[in-house]
Swiss-Prot record:
Residues 1-9 are cytoplasmic. It is found in: Cell inner membrane. NCBIfam families: PRK05089.1 (NF003465). Pfam families: CtaG_Cox11. Belongs to the COX11/CtaG family. One of its GO terms (biological process) is respiratory chain complex IV assembly. It is a single-pass type II membrane protein. InterPro entries: CtaG/Cox11_dom_sf, Cyt_c_oxidase_assmbl_CtaG. The chain crosses the membrane at residues 10-30. This is Cytochrome c oxidase assembly protein CtaG. Keywords: Cell inner membrane, Cell membrane, Copper, Membrane, Signal-anchor, Transmembrane, Transmembrane helix. PANTHER family: CYTOCHROME C OXIDASE ASSEMBLY PROTEIN COX11, MITOCHONDRIAL-RELATED, CYTOCHROME C OXIDASE ASSEMBLY PROTEIN COX11-RELATED.
Amino acid sequence: MSLSPHQKTAGGLVLVVAVMGAASFAAVPFYNWFCRVTGFAGTTAVATEAPAEVLDRTVKVRFDASREAGMPWEFRPLQREMKLKIGETGLAFYEAYNPTDRTVAGTASYNVTPDAAGGYFAKIACFCFTEQVLAPGERVEMPVTFYVDPAIIDDPDGRYVRQITLSYTFHETALTEEQAALAAESATDVN
């Protein structure tokens, strides 16, 4: 059985649409993986411990904080910058405050600039790894433990980095049913 030219064209178009649809679904996970592996777009690395090697060269790390439109929290770094040696572990704190009369959950997205530093800026522990839930009027200090990987000096672009900015943006997230129930329970008058 032979296909007519119209049937071949239609079959080819269906195949193209199917491949494009599959590629669009795979694009987001692939991009996220690519950014984690390469540090592209300022994506930081996650580490379990600091490196054994600490270099004499220092780098200035600046801290930035912002909120997504509609996020009611106040959010700020408790220090604006710090200098540390490459390979040395740093500890910085951010503060979040919920001025509302309701429990609010949020997650922090983050990035590092310049982009060349992203793959070498490693976090050991960070509030951004988990969702944060603040009760009405609650204020918390949230730590981030990090280091700059000594391998940065071997990178053709990274070796010129003298200042790195770590930026966080907090986004409001929906409370889980359990969190919402606890929030409602704590808001109920017990008299």
